[in-house]
């Protein structure tokens, strides 16, 4: 049993909770997720099973797309709807569509963002949420992120009321805290704010419409069709350039054999396949020997090569 499962993560579960539940359903210990989603966030969560856990790191650096909702009028400790109210300031004026769109434009491109206190970012060996739960405030590292697209989905021309909410879609780089973006939008508009809803609709090439629920996974297990839920390792890595080696080279790959970059591939990672179209390893450019490739992750062992 191996491959990538596109889980439609439900609300109220951590990514680790999802892994724990899948281990029980699939009766497989080698399971890992490809990037944390907050408990309140739903949507695309690629899960690697069996031998596919070796490729998890190559699926985490993908661009992500989310659809969510910002609420102006009060902020929270966690920057989302699960936290305690920190500041309240009723929206005492009409906010126009143009104002909101201009705020989104200023947050598009390469920007700096400070991670929230309630996050897993580590400072001095401790996670920020551990400091937050102890009531401690620490200096947080500013990170550079890229917002590829930030679009207002609400079709209203004006927004009014003591609290107002509007929907958005954002496509961003790995490491972006969308709830912090919601706070930044509020700052641009002059009001405390938080993220009131969020769903991840895409993680790289993996889309929400292709995801399945826990119930569907359990049904496939019961029906004996569990293999149908997996995206193969080869398919999951299809975005990377590919090299094919002969049988003799394939036997040496497990032992860390370097390869010549005969195809002059410039991409950072290269997948290496055998004549049977099975992915053997992922290679990268050798830092000291131009024109050579070195193994970054070997996906098979000698016993598997003889099968």
From Swiss-Prot:
It catalyses: uridine(55) in tRNA = pseudouridine(55) in tRNA. SUPFAM superfamilies: Pseudouridine synthase (SSF55120). The keyword Nucleus does not apply. GO terms for biological process: mRNA pseudouridine synthesis; tRNA pseudouridine synthesis. One of its GO terms (molecular function) is tRNA pseudouridine(55) synthase activity. The active site is at residue 38. Keywords: Isomerase, tRNA processing. Its EC number is 5.4.99.25. It holds the Pfam family TruB_N. Belongs to the pseudouridine synthase TruB family. Type 1 subfamily. PANTHER family: PSEUDOURIDYLATE SYNTHASE TRUB1 (PTHR13767:SF2), TRNA-PSEUDOURIDINE SYNTHASE (PTHR13767). Responsible for synthesis of pseudouridine from uracil-55 in the psi GC loop of transfer RNAs. HAMAP family: TruB_bact. This is tRNA pseudouridine synthase B. It comes from Bacillus cereus (strain ZK / E33L). The lineage of its organism: Bacteria, Bacillati, Bacillota, Bacilli, Bacillales.
């Amino acid at each position: 049993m191996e491959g990538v499962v596109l889980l439609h993560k439900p609300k109220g579960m951590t990514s680790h909770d999802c892994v724990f539940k899948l281990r029980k359903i699939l009766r497989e210990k080698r399971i890992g997720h490809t990037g944390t989603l907050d408990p309140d966030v739903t949507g695309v969560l690629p899960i690697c099973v069996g031998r596919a856990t070796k490729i998890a790191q190559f699926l985490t650096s993908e661009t992500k797309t989310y659809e969510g909702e910002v609420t102006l009028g009060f902020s929270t400790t966690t920057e989302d709807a699960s936290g305690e109210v920190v500041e309240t300031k009723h929206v005492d004026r009409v906010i126009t569509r143009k104002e909101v769109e201009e705020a989104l434009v200023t947050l598009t491109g390469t920007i700096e963002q400070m991670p929230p206190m309630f996050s897993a970012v580590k400072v001095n060996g401790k996670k920020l949420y551990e400091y937050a739960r102890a009531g401690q405030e620490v200096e947080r590292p500013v990170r550079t992120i890229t917002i590829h697209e930030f679009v207002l989905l609400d079709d209203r021309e004006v927004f009014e009321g003591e609290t107002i909410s509007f929907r958005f879609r954002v496509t961003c780089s790995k490491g972006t805290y969308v709830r912090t973006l919601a706070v930044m939008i509020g700052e641009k508009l002059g009001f405390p704010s938080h993220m009131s809803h969020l769903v991840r609709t895409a993680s790289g090439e993996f889309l929400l419409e292709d995801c399945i629920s826990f119930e569907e996974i359990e049904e496939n297990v019961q029906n004996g069709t569990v293999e149908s839920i997996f995206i193969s390792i080869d398919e999951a890595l299809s975005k990377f350039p590919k090299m094919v080696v002969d049988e003799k080279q394939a036997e040496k790959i497990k032992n860390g054999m370097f390869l010549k970059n005969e195809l002059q591939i410039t991409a950072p990672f290269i997948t290496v396949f055998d004549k049977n179209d099975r992915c053997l390893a992922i290679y990268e450019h050798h830092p000291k020997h131009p024109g050579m490739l070195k193994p970054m992750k070997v996906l098979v062992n000698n016993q598997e090569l003889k099968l």
